[in-house]
Amino acid sequence: MNRLLSLIIITASAFSHLNAQRVIYSEFDREDVRQTNFEIIGRYNSNVLVYKNLRNRNTISIYNADMKETQRVEIDYMPDRMTNVDFIAYPTYSWMIYQYQRKSVVYCVAAKIGPEGKKIGEPIQLDTTDISYSSSNKLYNFIYSEDKQQLMILKVNNKNEKKYMFKTLLFDKDLNMLKISRVILPMTDRNDILTEFSLDNEGHLIFGHGDRASNDQNILKFNLVQKQAQADTFSIKPINLDNITLDEVKIKADNSNGRYVLTSFYYKGKKNTIDGIFHSEWNKATDTEANNLAIPLNDDIRAEARGENNLRNAFNDYYLQQIVLRKDGGFVITAENLYTTNRGSANPFNRWNYFGSPYMNASDYYYYGGTGWGYPYNRWGNSVTRYNADNIVVMSFDKDGKLQWNNVIHKSQFDDDGEATISYTTVNTGDAVRFLYNDFEKRDPILALQSIASDGQIIRNPTLKNLGQGHTFLPRYARQTGQKQVIVPCQYRGFLTFAKIDF
């Protein structure tokens, strides 16, 4: 009797969990055509704020708990010629960092946005730059620490390919100035590259500097570069590469354990076949490399992950996507199989500038990264390129960098219009990490959900309720707005809408 009662309780709990998964859509507005640039700012109380830009019009839409648009706030203080907008959200307000060009001057300005989408106080000018040309690309990079207490804008003048001139401006969370620095980074060759920039909780800037033989080859030498919060110099720390070369390097500050974690796919020598995962740790206290591992990918995981490739080339189309740090010092990485197929004679594929590669080289004067907002359609400008996003590999490592488990989420996606509908997003609900992506098995893509538990087991969740109403999801641009809530942009009859998913 007790066992039967327990079974009933467990079953009821399971059905309750399934019923809790629901999707609520916003109504489409004819002003929100699919070319609209947007940024999901975050949730304030039960409202969700979304920034929108179309040509020279900038607004913030307020959606209530039922995803009804209750207000659209005009941002009339933003000028024309906008080149980039970034947001950082706090519990009671957010900062909007925007860039624009007027004549020959680029401005970087901050506006404080309240929960109702209206500005608090007057915009703050953070920096300006004189340039001699007209540009639609962003000039400044905006980064912030994990705890959001340290904020930085920075720009790089690489007109002199032997000496990159950095200007960094460090602020606290209220945008009080903490430090302005101008620092020169020596460069050895025009094929040198810089990785994405990161900021740790102490305000230290970190990034990577790689040396390549040519523009499309592997990294032969690699340095971790650090600028301490109050320093005016770079500290350059060589990373040991023992007869291997590297692919794209991801660097993350492990603030809980006082270290920097570096991860990359590696190749043996100068070959073009990915052999495994490279892992390095830099200890902040001792200022030394604390761990350095080259972890081969065995045949079992290659067989599971390979897709259309043979065993040896199983990972040649994979790109590292995320490093998720655990408090115990371990970490999880995800990698996705991304490639293009070309139906014409020209092939635009280049691994080093593909799918939003963060790298900057000497051809990018005053420029780093992309526009930073919206979503792309048909990047190559022709209809002969098909974008593909297939399997996701998830690997868990302990604090010493030893592989604990790995698993593969199988999917097959393609899009001829760009990258908007393919790839995935993750939602960390505490009990598991959920992967949301479009399933292309049927004629129209439908949103699928799979979860990975802490022991690496994959759980294929039932189809979410309230799907199939003509909405095409764009999961790669989603934003988690609560422990078990995510806002996902959608296309509906050629218009931009949004869906709220509660788990």
Residue ranges and their predicted role:
Residues 32-41, 79-89, 129-143, 189-197, ...:
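Repeated scaffold domains used in trafficking and secretory/extracellular systems
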Residues 238-250, 291-319, 406-424, 455-483:
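Conserved blade-ending motifs and adjacent loop-strand segments that build the rim/top face
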Residues 108-116, 165-176, 219-232, 275-288, ...:
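Beta-propeller blade signature
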Residues 1-25, 503:
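Bacterial Sec-dependent N-terminal signal peptides
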Residues 56-62, 103-111, 161-168, 214-225, ...:
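Structural motif
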Residues 32-148, 152-159, 163-167, 191-193:
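Post-signal peptide N-terminal segment of secreted/secretory-pathway proteins
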Residues 265, 320-340, 372-393, 416-457:
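Loop/turn-rich, solvent-exposed surfaces of beta-rich toroidal or solenoidal domains
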Residues 39-55, 87, 91-104, 141, ...:
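Short beta-strand elements that form the blades of beta-propeller/WD-repeat-like
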